[in-house]
Amino acid sequence: MAEAQAAVGTSSDRSNHYSRPVFKQVLKVNSLQAQRVMERSFERVSNSLFSIDVILRIIGEQDEIDQVETVILEQISKVSEDLDKATAQLNKLMEDNGIDMMPGYTNPNEYTIEINSPQVAQFAHLIRKLDTLMGIVDTLWLNTVLTSKQRTDATYQWQQRLIKLAGRIIGIEKRARISAHSKGKEGEVAEAAPESATGDKEIADEAEKTGEDKAA
């Protein structure tokens, strides 16, 4: 079994000012699509969610804090609900076809992750849900209920849903930094929550689009 690391930086990597609660967990991911989402986005999203929280506390305007937290929750909840609906539909398809066994995977990965906010926990849970859904898709494909094209379309669609969500969360972080800059708190924010680079072009483009949409 392969092992990988994600979001394992210590609190001193991010901020030396506060001692924050954190859970360390090992997240096992079977499917290729969930592994891609994990490796492309989890650490960067975790850093963004941490930074958003720090930046909003520095800005110190409760209405803005509540508004941003609500936007993030709504976006995560929408993807979660859609994953649940798709999972229920495909579970019914398995039941209708008398399928009650799931395949194993040849190369599952384990990721050591830090859960340092409720939103990070929710994003990790989305990846678990994605992994479960991909397992059902693969089961139906192996049993010839789904065609290869249907499998490819479904796996790509759901992988991209989470990748785009990651980009939107990073875009919200960028908007929070712009807001802090407009309030003269850029230096304080830079010290407490240094900005991380987004190496994945697709995620970076989605983040940029989110920032532009909200700034307009």
Question: What are the roles of these predicted feature ranges?
Answer:
Residues 150-155:
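Short hydrophobic alpha-helical segments that form membrane-spanning helices or hydrophobic packing faces
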